[in-house]
C-alpha cells in the first residue's frame, strides 16, 4: 500500500506543480519540463550539483518520496544520501547531495522538499511526545486526522518518530463510537455485530464514563478508548480493568482527548496501554530545509 501511495502522491504533486492535472494526459517528459518556464532559462545540457541541508534539529523522514520525485522526472538525477528515515538531525547537517541535469533538479526540488519537510515535521513531533512516555509502558498512537491523500505517508512518519499506528482506515479495525452505539442499540449489541461481521478484526469501543467502560468490558471488546477522561477517571478505569484481568478478561486501554505535550506524561503514569494524539498528523509544522546548487 505504501509503495503505491508514494507513487500516486508524487505524481499528483508534480502534476499540481507543472499544471497537468488531466488524469488522461500522456505528456512526454520533455513536455513536462517545458511547463517549468523558469527552469527553461537554463540550457538543457547543463549538469549541476546541489546540497540539501536542514536548518533545525529533528527526525528525518521522506527519503522514498524524494527519490520518487526525481524518478518520475526522468531518473537522471542521482541522490547521494547521508541520512536514513528515523535519523536524528541537527542544524546545518547535510542530508543529501544531488547531481544531474540542472533543469530536473530545479523542477523537482520544491516537490521533494515539501514531502521531506512535512514528513520530517510529523516524525519530529512524534519523537517529542514519545520522549514524554519514557519510563512507562504506554505507547503513542496516531489517528485518522491526517492530511487528505497523505494518510499512509504520515502514518509512516509517525513510526519513524517512534510512535505506533492506530487503524489505517475504516477497513482494518472496528472503532465503535457514540453514534454507532446509538444506532446499534447498545455497546453489547454493537460488539456482537462486529464479531459476527468480521471475527478477525480488532474491536475497539469508545466510552465516556465508567459505566460505559463496564459495558465494554462485559461485552469483551479488545480495546476501550477512554474519551476525555480526567486523571482520576483514568486511574479508576485502570483499576476496574485490572479486576477484570484477574478473572481472565480485561482489555487494552487507550486514552484520547485533551492530550498535549504537557499532559501526556501524567496520563501515561495512570497505567493505560495507549495514548492517541491527533496533533501528530493534524498540527503539522514543517522541518526547515534548504537546497542550494553548488
Go through the PLM ranges and name each one.
Residues 228, 257, 279:
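Short secondary-structure boundary segments
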Residues 290-294:
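Active-site loop ensemble at the mouth of alpha/beta enzyme cores that anchors a bound cofactor
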Amino acid at each position: 500500500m505504501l509503495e503505491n501511495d508514494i507513487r500516486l502522491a508524487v505524481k499528483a504533486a508534480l502534476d499540481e506543480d507543472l499544471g497537468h492535472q488531466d488524469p488522461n494526459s500522456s505528456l512526454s517528459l520533455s513536455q513536462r519540463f517545458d511547463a517549468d518556464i523558469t527552469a527553461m532559462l537554463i540550457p538543457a545540457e547543463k549538469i549541476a550539483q546541489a546540497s540539501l541541508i536542514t536548518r533545525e534539529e529533528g527526525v528525518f523522514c521522506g527519503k522514498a518520496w524524494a527519490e520518487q520525485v526525481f524518478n518520475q522526472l526522468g531518473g537522471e538525477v542521482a541522490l547521494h544520501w547521508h541520512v536514513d528515515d528515523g535519523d536524528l538531525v541537527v542544524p546545518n547537517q547535510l542530508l543529501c547531495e544531488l547531481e544531474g541535469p540542472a533543469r530536473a533538479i530545479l523542477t523537482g526540488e520544491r516537490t521533494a522538499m515539501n514531502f521531506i519537510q512535512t514528513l520530517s515535521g510529523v516524525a519530529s513531533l512524534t519523537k517529542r511526545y514519545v520522549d514524554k512516555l519514557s519510563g512507562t509502558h504506554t505507547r503513542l498512537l496516531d489517528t485518522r486526522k491526517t492530511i487528505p491523500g497523505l494518510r499512509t505517508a504520515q502514518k509512516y512518519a509517525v513510526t519513524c518518530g517512534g510512535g505506533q499506528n492506530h487503524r489505517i482506515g475504516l477497513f482494518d479495525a472496528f472503532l465503535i463510537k457514540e453514534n454507532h452505539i446509538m444506532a446499534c442499540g447498545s455497546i453489547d449489541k454493537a460488539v456482537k455485530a462486529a464479531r459476527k461481521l468480521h471475527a478477525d478484526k480488532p474491536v475497539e469501543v469508545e466510552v465516556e464514563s465508567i459505566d460505559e467502560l463496564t459495558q465494554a468490558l462485559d461485552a469483551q471488546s479488545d480495546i476501550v478508548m477512554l474519551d476525555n477522561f480526567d486523571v482520576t477517571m483514568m486511574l479508576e478505569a485502570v483499576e476496574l480493568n485490572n479486576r477484570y484481568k484477574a478473572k481472565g478478561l480485561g482489555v487494552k486501554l487507550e486514552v484520547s482527548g485533551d492530550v498535549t505535550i504537557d499532559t501526556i506524561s501524567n496520563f501515561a503514569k495512570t497505567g493505560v496501554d495507549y495514548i492517541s494524539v491527533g496533533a501528530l498528523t493534524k498540527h503539522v509544522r514543517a522541518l526547515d530545509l534548504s537546497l542550494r546548487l553548488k
